[in-house]
Swiss-Prot record, chain A:
The keyword Zinc does not apply. GO terms for cellular component: plasma membrane; proton-transporting ATP synthase complex. GO terms for biological process: proton motive force-driven plasma membrane ATP synthesis. This is ATP synthase subunit a. Pfam families: ATP-synt_A. The lineage of its organism: Bacteria, Bacillati, Bacillota, Bacilli, Lactobacillales. GO terms for molecular function: proton-transporting ATP synthase activity, rotational mechanism. The chain crosses the membrane at residues 18-38, 76-96, 114-134, 150-170, 188-208, 211-231. Keywords: ATP synthesis, Cell membrane, CF(0), Hydrogen ion transport, Ion transport, Membrane, Transmembrane, Transmembrane helix, Transport. Belongs to the ATPase A chain family. It is found in: Cell membrane.
Length: 238, 173
């Protein structure tokens, strides 16, 4: 972000960041188009693209299955599926496509902005807490979350929940932001000097991009895994 | 993160609350669209497949039981037919033996009666032949005698003949 200006605008008294709006919209569109294309012409005996879709569904269901029971798996399956795909695409999109104009980038990884990752994290935490209340009632939920194992644990309980929310969002932001920044720096090296710089920078960029793809996938997986763990903390009866 | 927020603030605003709202709505809309176009159909299809597979397993089990039953039935029928065939053959043998005995008995009787009749016929024939032969011999001898008598009616022989008769007469008394 060093020295880079940001395009914002005000609407209904709220501040919007144009970059995040565009990036998020593009990511969501890509996710939807891919899923829509994969889910056409479903057959009882799966072939080709249907196998891919079923594999992704099975993958995110498998993440849930590790921490919650079967009934909850059905309830949160769609959430985990959408979350995983959206974060995955968001992580990867900035690696191969960044559009900047007048020193303002309009398209990059939306997850390279903490406000986006914290929003996703907040959605997860709200969903988890809501599910806990919906399942056990407020009294038991409160006791289970904040007053266990002892009543004096209350401050630590509150703090833990807040830390969970922060780390969930900031972990992914850190990785993706750092990845993009380094990629930008490598790009800067490539275009700052002569042909020698370019030759040095190309394999560097290649290696770092590959590594970032790996990191982005891992982070999407970790985000969904932690989501399911947090949800299971709230809805599972120990 | 904080520098970022400060940058945001420098532009004359606080946190990008609008972004949070936008992302929350975007995410919900995306989830709804995926639910409608992919998640629902895929899960329905998966459920259908699971049902189909369990049905297939059930029906396979049923078919297996049915096949076993049929095989058992067939085996029983085969055993029955073996027994039946044996009894039929035995019956046929028995009746064949009876028939044979009957035929042989009849044939023997017939042959015996034929033989008896043939014997009788031969006896009759012989008796007839003998009788006719006697007749023939008698007439022949008479003829021969008459011819001999006619030819050799001379004195000497006549005399001898008469003598012998007379002698014969004296002997017979």
């Amino acid at each position: 972000m060093s020295g880079e200006s940001i395009s914002t605008f005000q609407f209904l008294g709220l501040t919007f960041n144009t970059t995040n709006l565009i990036s998020g919209l593009v990511s969501a569109l890509i996710v939807f188009c891919v899923v829509f294309a994969l889910s056409r012409n479903l057959k009882l005996k799966p072939t080709g693209k249907q196998n891919i879709l079923e594999w992704i569904v099975d993958f995110t269901n498998g993440i849930l299955r590790d921490s919650v029971d079967e009934e909850e798996e059905k309830n949160f399956g769609l959430y985990a599926f959408t979350l995983f795909l959206f974060i995955f695409v968001s992580n990867q999109i900035g690696l191969f496509l960044q559009i900047a104009w007048n020193d303002v980038s309009y398209l990059r990884s939306p997850t390279a902005d903490p406000i986006v990752t914290l929003t996703l994290s907040l959605i997860t935490m709200m969903l988890a807490h809501y599910s806990g209340v919906a399942k056990f009632g407020f009294k038991k939920y409160f006791e289970k979350t904040y007053l266990s194992p002892f009543k004096v644990w209350l401050p630590i309980g509150v703090f833990t929940e807040f830390i969970d929310f922060l780390t969930l969002g900031l972990r992914i932001y850190g990785v993706i932001f750092a990845g993009e920044m380094l990629l930008k720096m490598i790009g800067g090296i490539a275009f700052s000097g002569g042909i020698v710089n370019m030759i040095v920078a190309i394999p560097l960029a290649l290696i770092w991009q590959g590594f970032s793809v790996f990191l982005g996938s891992i982070q999407a997986f970790v985000f969904v895994t932690l989501t399911s763990v947090y949800i299971s903390h709230k809805v599972e009866d120990e | 993160m904080f520098s970022h927020i400060t940058v945001g603030a420098a532009h004359g605003s606080t946190l990008y609350v609008g972004d949070m709202l936008f992302y929350a709505i975007l995410f919900i809309v995306l989830m709804a669209l995926i639910a409608k176009f992919a998640w629902g159909p895929v899960n329905a299809m998966l459920k259908e497949r699971a049902d189909r597979i369990s049905n297939d397993i059930d029906s396979a089990e049923q078919s297996r039981i049915e096949a076993e039953k049929l095989a058992k039935q067939r085996k029983e029928a085969l055993d029955n037919s073996h027994a039946e065939a044996t009894s039929i053959i035995n019956n046929a043998k028995d009746s064949g033996a009876k028939e044979r005995e009957l035929i042989i008995g009849n044939a023997q009787n017939e042959a015996k009666s034929l033989k008896d009749k043939a014997k009788q016929d031969i006896e009759q024939e012989r008796a007839d032949a003998l009788k006719s032969a006697q007749d023939d011999i008698a007439s022949l001898s008479i003829e021969i005698a008459s011819k001999v008598i006619k030819k050799e009616l001379d004195e000497n022989s006549q005399k001898d003949l008469i003598d012998s008769y007379i002698e014969g007469l004296g002997d017979s008394k």
